[in-house]
Amino acid sequence: MAGSERGVKHNMMTHVGTMTVETDRLLLRKFAYNDDESMLKNWVADEKVQAMYAEPTYTTKEAVRGLLDKYIGGYESPNYYRWAIFEKDGAECIGQIAYFLMDDKNHFGEIEYCIGEAFQRKGYATEATKAAIAYGFEQVGLHKVQISHMSNNLPSRRVIEKCGFCYEGTQRDYFYVDGQYVDRLFYSMLEEEYHTME
């Protein structure tokens, strides 16, 4: 089997659920229903932000509460990892980051994130992504973390490169957005690479 020559043994993953994480400037915590107004204000209603990670827009409080039902309900499972992103000195949800895929059999998870337009170009996406990477390797025991971006999303490419991911390949015409096909660029980081960077 391809890759078996590496001979890397791995301990079992330990699911711990979504716990609060603090970085230098950010607070990552579970979503709550009272996040609805700042979510609407900062990102979920923004077509440009949502399109960059292939998500629909949510333009009413009722729609956002439906989304929050899904997010908050997910916290009942210990293998569900989704954080609301806040500035430490702020009271508004400025984005989100999650492991939207967890593969227990093969010991990997895949990250997605978004940051509201008004809070971009501040390094927040990189800071939150590095925190999620550390959580995956140190708390959950992942062997590999994956991430991707649309070929037309150059800011996400810069975030991914700053975090130290290794480019794996391009999935051609993976997304269909606004009447055209867009490639998906795929990256990963192995646990030994993560520990080398620490």
Regions found by a protein language model. Give the residues of each.
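A short helix-loop-beta-strand connector motif used in the catalytic cores of GNAT acetyltransferases and
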Residues: 70-84
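Short, conserved alpha-helical segments within structured domains
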Residues: 59-60, 81, 152
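A short hydrophobic/aromatic micro-motif that marks alpha-helical segments and, especially, helix-coil
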Residues: 60-62, 75, 194
